[in-house]
Regions:
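Sec-dependent signal peptide recognition
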Residues: 2-9
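Enrichment for repetitive, rod-forming helical segments
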Residues: 9-11, 143
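N-terminal signal peptide c-region/cleavage motif recognized by signal peptidases
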Residues: 14-16
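A generic "folded-domain core" signal
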Residues: 19-184
Length: 184
């Protein structure tokens, strides 16, 4: 399952036009792995093994400090959903202790199907949404997705230090780009 999720992750981060993906480790914080992709994007990902072999999930967050945008992808093998189209709206919430923060409301998630899994992706456009998402990710205990009244998933985060490293990674790329621009 891990290799299948990593395959979907590679498609998300590299883009269809890339001939070859270059992924370099940046940091490992708890169960979060932070990498640079193609020397231009920073990604943090966490794999969640399921109770049975076909029940694993993953969260992938892509962040650009230059654009102040973030992308969230939830990957699962067997989503409990109606017939899938190209997009579905999920309620995005965060849990802290027993308190559910549902201020994000309904968000459209683009659907990609691979042979062994589904990827549900939402882009937080603009600095306000991107920064707010990272703050909530860092300060809450779990990310929760609902479809209608039913909960799809609740994944533990423990992401405060990982988000700090993700921001550091992205800032270094912006700094390197500025340095490269001065060298030309």
């Amino acid at each position: 399952m891990r290799s299948r999720i990593i395959g979907v992750y590679a498609l998300l981060s590299a883009g269809a036009s890339q001939a070859e993906r270059v992924s370099e480790p940046f940091a490992k914080v708890g169960y979060w792995e932070i990498t640079t992709e193609n020397h231009s994007t920073c990604v943090m990902k966490s794999l969640y093994p399921g109770k049975v072999a076909d029940d694993a999930e993953a969260l992938i967050i892509v962040y650009s400090a230059r654009q102040k945008t973030a992308v969230l992808s939830w990957i699962t093998q067997k989503p409990k959903l109606p017939a899938l189209t190209q997009s579905l709206d999920f309620e995005l919430s965060f849990l802290k202790g027993r308190s559910l923060n549902s201020l994000w409301g309904s968000r459209p998630f683009h659907i990609e199907k691979s042979p062994h899994s589904y990827s549900f992706t939402h882009a937080f456009r603009g600095p306000m949404d991107g920064e707010r998402f990272l703050r909530d990710l860092a300060s809450h205990d779990a990310l929760v997705l609902f479809f209608g009244p039913g909960m799809l998933t609740s994944l533990p985060l423990k992401a405060s230090d990982a988000v700090t490293k993700l921001r550091e990674c992205s800032s270094k790329i912006v700094g390197q780009d500025a340095f490269d621009g001065l060298q030309k």
